[in-house]
Amino acid sequence: MEVKAIHRGARISAQKTRLVADQIRGLSIERALNVLTFSPKKAAGIVKKVVESAIANAEHNEGADIDELKVKSIYIDKATSLKRFTARAKGRGNRIEKQTCHITVTLGN
């Protein structure tokens, strides 16, 4: 049995989020939530919400026992960038790209 949760367009770069995702890949649910709770990174809070959503999906849709679940796979994909401009000297402007990503978590036995 596999249960999936996806968060699309998370307002953080894929590179920063992958650092957190690599820490919890393959861990049990309880251990993964502990790692995410005590991580100081912004991405940890976002990934934790996606993992909790996957747990809720497992309980509600599949009726699964959450004590047996593990983080089977977690992957982070780059999403579209938000283009912004910032003012520079002498009436010029520079483009800023604010990165976004898609977070996909799969839980299984």
Swiss-Prot record:
Belongs to the universal ribosomal protein uL22 family. It comes from Ralstonia pickettii (strain 12J). Keywords: Ribonucleoprotein, Ribosomal protein, RNA-binding, rRNA-binding. The keyword Repeat does not apply. One of its GO terms (cellular component) is cytosolic large ribosomal subunit. This protein binds specifically to 23S rRNA; its binding is stimulated by other ribosomal proteins, e.g. L4, L17, and L20. It is important during the early stages of 50S assembly. It makes multiple contacts with different domains of the 23S rRNA in the assembled 50S subunit and ribosome. The globular domain of the protein is located near the polypeptide exit tunnel on the outside of the subunit, while an extended beta-hairpin is found that lines the wall of the exit tunnel in the center of the 70S ribosome. This is Large ribosomal subunit protein uL22. One of its GO terms (biological process) is translation. The keyword rRNA-binding applies. PROSITE patterns: RIBOSOMAL_L22. Part of the 50S ribosomal subunit. It comes from the Bacteria. GO terms for molecular function: rRNA binding; structural constituent of ribosome. InterPro entries: Ribosomal_uL22, Ribosomal_uL22_bac/chlpt-type, Ribosomal_uL22_bac/org-type, Ribosomal_uL22_CS, Ribosomal_uL22_sf.
